[in-house]
């Protein structure tokens, strides 16, 4: 089904923020209630990631955005692949950043906010060898460089709803790990570790240090947009499990809690 763009009027999206009670979102000077409702937009029907085709098949992206808007969405979650946005540990890809800027303008014209989820490594074959070889400190520096570049592009646009630092990050237990990416699901690696070795530190210490470094990177260029990190509610699978990234002593610099539930049909 086609959704012609000519029928869409340019819409002025208002800035969003956490409300004064800290239990929801509002937008604009009147603090109108905002309830995010939308789609994950991470791959097409053949499994291609957005960056695989957004340069050559822009009309497809525009049509998809129009369709999502027509279906009642007000927000779209975009998954940015680190390997497409970083050419080297400290060198962002200018072409990818320009295309992200184009996407932000498309979203604004269509009337859709964006959740920009970053640092993705969903296709293992596309993860740069140099990135996989970095030790923890250097890897975090590259991740900070990534977020600085993204924040520079998005800082002045109300289209950005939030920056989601990483999709469902995890840490090792006591045993040292050897792989940054965890298991595969449907040909993709949606989850990655932020360290391979606790090295005598607690999980909370590592999580806090990582969060603070990335939040600081964003805030160097963008003091306004909300920052979060999407996590799995482990307590539903493991009774008694405690939140890590949203523990008070860990996630104090995040703006809101983002928990990923996967309901079945008719269970929303």
Task: Pin down the residues of each PLM region.
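Active-site mouth of glycoside hydrolases
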Residues: 13-257, 261-267
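Bacterial N-terminal signal peptides
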Residues: 1-4
């Amino acid at each position: 089904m086609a959704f012609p763009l000519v029928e869409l009027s340019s819409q002025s999206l208002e800035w969003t923020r956490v409300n004064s009670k800290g239990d929801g979102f509002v937008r604009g000077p009147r603090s109108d209630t905002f309830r995010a409702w939308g789609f994950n937009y991470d791959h097409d029907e053949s499994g291609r990631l957005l960056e695989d085709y957004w340069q050559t098949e822009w009309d497809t992206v525009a049509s998809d955005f129009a369709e999502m808007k027509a279906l009642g969405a007000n927000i779209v979650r975009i998954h940015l692949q680190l390997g497409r946005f970083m050419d080297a540990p400290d060198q962002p890809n200018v072409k990818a950043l320009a295309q992200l800027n184009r996407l932000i303008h498309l979203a604004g014209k269509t009337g859709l906010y964006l959740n920009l989820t970053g640092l993705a490594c969903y296709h293992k074959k596309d993860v740069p060898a140099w990135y996989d070889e970095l030790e923890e400190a250097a890897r975090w520096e590259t991740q900070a460089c990534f977020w600085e570049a993204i924040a520079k592009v998005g800082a002045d646009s109300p289209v950005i709803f939030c920056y989601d630092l990483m999709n469902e990050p995890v840490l090792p237990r006591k045993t040292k790990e050897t792989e940054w990416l965890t298991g595969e699901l449907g040909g993709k690696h949606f989850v990655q570790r932020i360290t391979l070795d606790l090295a005598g530190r607690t999980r909370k210490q590592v999580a806090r240090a990582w969060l603070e470094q990335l939040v600081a990177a964003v805030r160097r260029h963008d003091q306004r947009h909300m920052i979060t990190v999407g996590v799995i509610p482990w307590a539903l699978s493991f009774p008694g499990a405690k939140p890590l990234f949203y523990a008070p002593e860990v996630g104090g610099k995040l703006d809101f809690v983002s928990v990923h539930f996967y309901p079945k049909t008719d269970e929303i």
